[in-house]
A protein has these predicted regions:
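Membrane-proximal structural modules of membrane-associated proteins and complexes
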Residues: 1-199
Length: 199
């Protein structure tokens, strides 16, 4: 486990304030199970020992954040770097409102690619750049899930290499995306503002 790694996450909505504790305990139990799996030896069967060091204050703080009945994404993060065989690990938690982060067709990143004057490796690096920029924006916005690329990336690369002039390449949100994620990205190639093809 590395510092800041998400151990568990869940979308929660608590209608009755007294149900908040059960919801938080369930997410912490999932985090404990996941930590046991991640920190057990490769051939060993993961145990379900209490590896996550949880305090009553941490539980109270999370309950206070989510008990208003709105939708929240609750995330449990590793507070440090841990290796196999650790007996206890520290964590920190975050509860963020599940709200619209990116609208469908919103531009996330832009670059240019010119297969006439660039090697195929340079073209691929440009595409990876817009994907990385999209992932960065998603993480900064609090989206937990990994970015998913719509369609076939390799087909897009092949089509791009057949165009023998500079085109604009954009990463756009394929659909409305909320904090819970995932962010689905569509990669689009444009020439003079007109879409040529996309993933």
């Amino acid at each position: 486990l590395v510092r800041g790694q998400v151990i568990a996450a869940g979308l929660v909505s608590v209608e009755k304030p007294n149900a908040a504790q059960a919801v938080i305990i369930q997410i912490l139990q999932e985090a404990n199970r996941n930590a046991n799996i991640l920190l057990s030896e490769p051939d060993a069967t993961p145990t379900n020992k209490e590896i996550l060091r949880v305090t009553k204050d941490q539980i109270r703080q999370l309950i206070a954040q989510i008990k208003d009945g709105r939708e929240y994404v609750v995330r449990i993060f590793s507070a440090g770097n841990y290796v196999r065989g650790e007996k206890q690990i520290e964590f920190f938690a975050d509860a963020a409102r599940n709200q619209l982060v990116f609208s469908a067709r919103e531009v996330l990143a832009t670059t240019t690619a010119d297969s006439k004057n660039m090697t195929s490796e340079q073209v691929r690096q440009r595409l990876e750049l817009v994907i990385s920029a999209s992932q960065f924006r998603a993480r900064n916005a609090g989206i937990v899930e990994d970015v998913q690329i719509e369609g076939t990336f390799l087909r897009f690369v092949n089509q791009l290499q057949q165009i023998q002039q500079e085109v604009e390449v954009k990463a756009i949100a394929a659909e409305d995306t909320y904090t819970v994620g995932p962010l689905r990205v569509k990669i689009v190639a444009l020439l003079n503002g007109k879409i040529l093809f996309s993933t």
